[in-house]
């Protein structure tokens, strides 16, 4: 029994209006009203994929991990009990706020709140209308992209995400942090998406380094690059990754030290996949231009 996909992300931020402008006018998501004090944003037929609420954290507040049905949720509850992982069941108010039929609330070993849920609301009768030129995002069985989790102990995090939640290692990249220093990043999948979560001991005081959204076309990436370049947010130029071979760029969000990766064209994981190790993050490109544009 394992998690099936990443369903949603919730952020607590100091500047909600800046995030609203960023997610709609730059990234192209659709504003979708609110739930409690959180503004909601759509990327597809789901009622929401990203939530932004006011808070001093300026970081990822929670991540929603999806299973297929109530029986799968109960199997995950049993697995958590067997592993000695504390959890609570979301009450009716939280289920209504998240627009799901059931959920379990827990934390990973380093304090990131996780919500394992089933039964998300879908609203096909209200088509997704992007707020900026983008043909759409790749979601469905692969979920809403990925995020890179910053952890102090990668081995401990790996044990939790693989042995308890059922993620599987795709590969490792030894990311150069200096002339003689590298950090191994472990990339984990739970469906055809090359990685839904990556784990790395990056020396930044944030829960995540970045989150990624996958667009439908290469032109979507180009148009988004121009919008975010005009906004002065580009941190890495266009490039293609070695492991998943996504063509993408990186840009600052309104919360310091958290970036978005906007990409297209990754390869997918299937039963023939074999684990590999890479010494570079990019086949080409992804030149850092932080503070230069």
UniProtKB/Swiss-Prot annotation:
Pathway connected to this protein: Xenobiotic degradation; biphenyl degradation; 2-hydroxy-2,4-pentadienoate and benzoate from biphenyl: step 3/4
Reactions it catalyzes: biphenyl-2,3-diol + O2 = 2-hydroxy-6-oxo-6-phenylhexa-2,4-dienoate + H(+)
Organism: Pseudomonas sp. (strain KKS102)
Keyword Iron carried by entry: yes
Residues that coordinate or bind Fe cation: 146, 210, 261
Cofactor(s) annotated in UniProt: Fe(2+)
Lineage top rank: taxon: Bacteria
InterPro entries the record matches: DiOHbiphenyl_dOase, Glyas_Bleomycin-R_OHBP_Dase, Glyas_Fos-R_dOase_dom, VOC, Xdiol_ring_cleave_dOase_1/2
Membership in a protein family: Belongs to the extradiol ring-cleavage dioxygenase family.
One example GO MF annotation: ferrous iron binding
Subunit: Homooctamer.
Protein name (record): Biphenyl-2,3-diol 1,2-dioxygenase
Protein keywords: Aromatic hydrocarbons catabolism, Dioxygenase, Iron, Metal-binding, Oxidoreductase, Repeat
Gene3D superfamilies: 2,3-Dihydroxybiphenyl 1,2-Dioxygenase, domain 1 (3.10.180.10)
VOC domain sequence ranges: 5-119, 143-265
Keyword Iron listed: yes
E.C. designation(s): 1.13.11.39
Biological process according to GO: xenobiotic catabolic process
């Amino acid at each position: 029994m394992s998690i099936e996909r990443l369903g949603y992300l919730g952020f607590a931020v100091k500047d909600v209006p800046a995030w609203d402008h960023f997610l709609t006018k730059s990234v192209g998501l659709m504003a979708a009203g609110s739930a409690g004090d959180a503004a909601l944003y759509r990327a597809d037929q789901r009622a929401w994929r990203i939530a932004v609420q006011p808070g001093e954290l300026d970081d990822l507040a929670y991540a929603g991990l999806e299973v297929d049905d109530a029986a799968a949720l109960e199997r995950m509850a049993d697995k958590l009990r067997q592993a000695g992982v504390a959890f609570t069941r979301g009450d009716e108010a939280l289920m209504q706020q998240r627009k799901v039929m059931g959920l379990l609330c827990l934390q990973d070993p380093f304090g990131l709140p996780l919500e394992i849920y089933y039964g998300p609301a879908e609203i096909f009768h209200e088509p997704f209308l992007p707020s900026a030129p983008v043909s759409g995002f790749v979601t469905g069985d692969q979920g809403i992209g990925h995020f890179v989790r910053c952890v102090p102990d990668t081995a401990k995090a790996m044990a939790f995400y693989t042995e308890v939640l059922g993620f599987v290692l795709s590969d490792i990249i030894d990311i150069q942090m200096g002339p003689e220093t590298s950090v191994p990043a472990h990339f984990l999948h739970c469906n055809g998406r090359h990685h839904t979560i990556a784990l790395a001991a990056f020396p930044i005081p944030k829960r995540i380094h970045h989150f990624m959204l996958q667009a439908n076309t290469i032109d979507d990436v180009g148009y988004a690059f121009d919008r975010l370049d005009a906004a002065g947010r580009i941190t890495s130029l266009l490039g293609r990754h070695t492991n998943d071979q996504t063509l993408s760029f990186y840009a600052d969000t309104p919360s310091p030290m958290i970036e978005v990766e906007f990409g297209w064209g990754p390869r997918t994981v299937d039963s023939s996949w074999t684990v590999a190790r890479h010494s570079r993050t990019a086949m080409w490109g992804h030149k850092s231009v932080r503070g230069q544009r």
